[in-house]
């Protein structure tokens, strides 16, 4: 049994102020992108926005380096991190709900998940969107299926989580890997 199976399940709804915080961060990010034109550096713009006083958290994330920027915490005690993935990470959090808010994609992306009927699902990633992953739900962001992947492919998102996910991140089952291959048409990455 995976270690995360012994953790208490944390499945919450985000509070209105958490959702509003995300909407405001994304709105300011969109304004910065529109104003910068071709000179736009999305990671630096996001770093500058998250450093603003109006977006300060109870515990501010470490915004140094290339990311991920972790260790932020909001007034509800939930973790806030900015994550930058240049590759697919298919995994699950057995005991933790996660909320992911895509900020930008270099290229195009889809979110892999499994619906209530156990069928694999690919959902287009839209900047400013919201992906909710219930405890135990396998998930991954990946380059859009059938579209050539640019060399600089990357997805950036802000995650709001109930705990440090290092203690609750697990590989998916062989069955999930087979479902991934069914819709993506390539082998699933080995995972975490």
Predicted regions and their residues:
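Conserved short histidine dyad/triad with adjacent acidic residue
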Residues: 80-97
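Short glycine/proline-enriched turns and hinge-like loops at secondary-structure junctions
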Residues: 94-96, 116, 145
């Amino acid at each position: 049994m995976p270690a995360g199976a012994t953790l208490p399940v944390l499945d919450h709804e985000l509070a209105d102020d958490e959702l509003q915080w995300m909407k405001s961060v994304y709105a300011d990010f969109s304004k910065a992108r529109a104003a910068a034109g071709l000179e736009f550096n999305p990671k630096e713009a996001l770093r500058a926005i998250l450093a603003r006083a109006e977006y300060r958290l109870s515990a501010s994330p470490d915004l140094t380096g290339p990311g991920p920027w972790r260790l932020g915490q909001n007034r509800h005690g939930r973790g806030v991190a900015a994550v930058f993935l240049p590759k697919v990470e298919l995994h699950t959090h057995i005991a933790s709900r996660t909320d992911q808010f895509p900020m930008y994609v270099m290229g195009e992306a889809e979110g892999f998940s499994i619906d209530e009927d156990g069928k694999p699902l690919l959902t287009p990633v839209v900047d400013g969107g919201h992906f909710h992953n219930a405890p135990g739900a396998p998930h991954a962001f990946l380059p859009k299926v059938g579209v050539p992947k640019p060399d600089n492919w990357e997805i950036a998102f802000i995650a709001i989580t109930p705990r440090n996910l290092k203690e609750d991140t697990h590989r998916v089952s062989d069955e999930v890997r087979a479902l991934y291959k069914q819709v993506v048409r390539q082998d699933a990455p080995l995972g975490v």
